């Protein structure tokens, strides 16, 4: 999927609205003067005169409407000097622990405060630093946090189940953003740290009940480019760590983050101590670590 942005004059705006009137859709963003869904392309006309076209046929529709495209969002570095929602997830690459997804709403006036806290790509911050600043961010920044526990994850994700490893993330990001928008925040753009293509995201999105009309943009390594995504990454990391701590305390074993050999070893110990039910409660069963742990446990017999 591509996103096209063009600047149009007032006369062109009126003509555009008349042409797309039969395809008009409702939207709650006061910055958007008109919204339509035309030939599977979302058309958002902002009061500033900016027209955003998003969909697989965005370039074709822009030409059909008589506009010369000025820029594609996948070829430019977007600024962040406007209100935006950023969304990120943590835990998808870890065998133990749940899957945390957070969407955050950040305004330009928040930037100085966030920089003073040292907000950056959470992957470059220590867990100790994340545990320190996450509560401050949760108090200051409007956000929505979702945690899919391993036990719930295993009922939803896997062969023959409702979701796969990608579609479950689409569902969680969509729900977090949807719920944050219910708090009456008004973003000019919604950025998701890319974990799949736009087209694949939209394909999985079709099955979700809760929908919103605001356009989304998936950008790789967005947490290092947008403070809103960095905030979400930090809050999500803290939520994941708290879940991992709680599971470790309940089971009496220190559960590692990640999906390396250490996870295999701890999983085999859990199998010996409690059986498969311990992994179903604390880990993502469809990971290859499960079979490796079973093999390790058998060698010890």
From Swiss-Prot:
One of its GO terms (biological process) is mismatch repair. It is an enzyme of class 3 (hydrolase). Residues 82-299 form the RNase H type-2 domain. Its EC number is 3.1.26.4. GO terms for cellular component: cytoplasm; ribonuclease H2 complex. Pfam families: DUF3378 (PF11858), RNase_HII (PF01351). Its cofactor is Mn(2+); Mg(2+). Keywords: Cytoplasm, Endonuclease, Hydrolase, Magnesium, Metal-binding, Nuclease. GO terms for molecular function: magnesium ion binding; RNA binding; RNA-DNA hybrid ribonuclease activity. It catalyses: Endonucleolytic cleavage to 5'-phosphomonoester. Belongs to the RNase HII family. RnhC subfamily. Endonuclease that specifically degrades the RNA of RNA-DNA hybrids. This is Ribonuclease HIII. It comes from Streptococcus uberis (strain ATCC BAA-854 / 0140J).
